[in-house]
Swiss-Prot record:
It comes from Pongo abelii. Pfam families: SFXNs (PF03820). Mitochondrial serine transporter that mediates transport of serine into mitochondria, an important step of the one-carbon metabolism pathway. Mitochondrial serine is converted to glycine and formate, which then exits to the cytosol where it is used to generate the charged folates that serve as one-carbon donors. The chain crosses the membrane at residues 146-164, 174-194, 226-246, 266-286. This is Sideroflexin-3.
Amino acid sequence: MGELPLDINIQEPRWDQSTFLGRARHFFTVTDPRNLLLSGAQLEASRNIVQNYRAGVVTPGITEDQLWRAKYVYDSAFHPDTGEKVVLIGRMSAQVPMNMTITGCMLTFYRKTPTVVFWQWVNQSFNAIVNYSNRSGDTPITVRQLGTAYVSATTGAVATALGLKSLTKHLPPLVGRFVPFAAVAAANCINIPLMRQRELQVGIPVADEAGQRLGYSVTAAKQGIFQVVISRICMAIPAMAIPPLIMDTLEKKDFLKRRPWLGAPLQVGLVGFCLVFATPLCCALFPQKSSIHVSKLEPELRAQIHEQNPSIEVVYYNKGL
């Protein structure tokens, strides 16, 4: 077997990101919870394989599949800009197990005010860790911005949950089960724009098809943030809509009436099953490298791009996660 060639582009995902299927395969790999079980030595080995390959040194005996596996293990644990190891619960591979536990508990303990407040706070604390761990190198999050987004999202989620809880007191019990979803949706609408407020102020980098940076656009930032909010809300729908319907039916059966302690683990399991599919599929709704027509950009940036290259009609940007 010959040595692996050096022309494999491991800077980009393995699968075609212009198709939904290609993006889905990419995110199924990125969010794979099994990556959390890898030891520090395994993570370092993957980092060495990737960094050596990028430097033009091929690890002896490695296959293309092993190279791609090392790339995804490396990406799952290390920050792409700083190279620092991301805290365990801040990694994309922790999304399913962490959200499974938190969402399952939000859906189980939705009746009493103290537990509603507690689990909404836990959820927003986890979101803050994820957002900080995956912050952009171009537009870093300051501690003040993180704190503002955290407090605002937590307040918004708790206020929505308690307000709707009060309004649904006299409605069928099934309606009350959907209050946590409304709170999470409201929090996403607050948290993500605040967390990325610097992008809304100065814009995000836009580039041509070859990756040549052309400037910064607030319009592109707004479009990217909107797409992320939609993805996050869609991600929560299956996990926060399907289990309540199933649990509402099961709790009327004698089996669960005699074993009420089974309610929480059963709900967490149902949420986990939904999230295993919803997380990667909803991350794949929009291309990571999104596009926008030059005609929709700010007049100054539009003029600047036309001056550099009048033939450019579409520019690209990283929408974030």
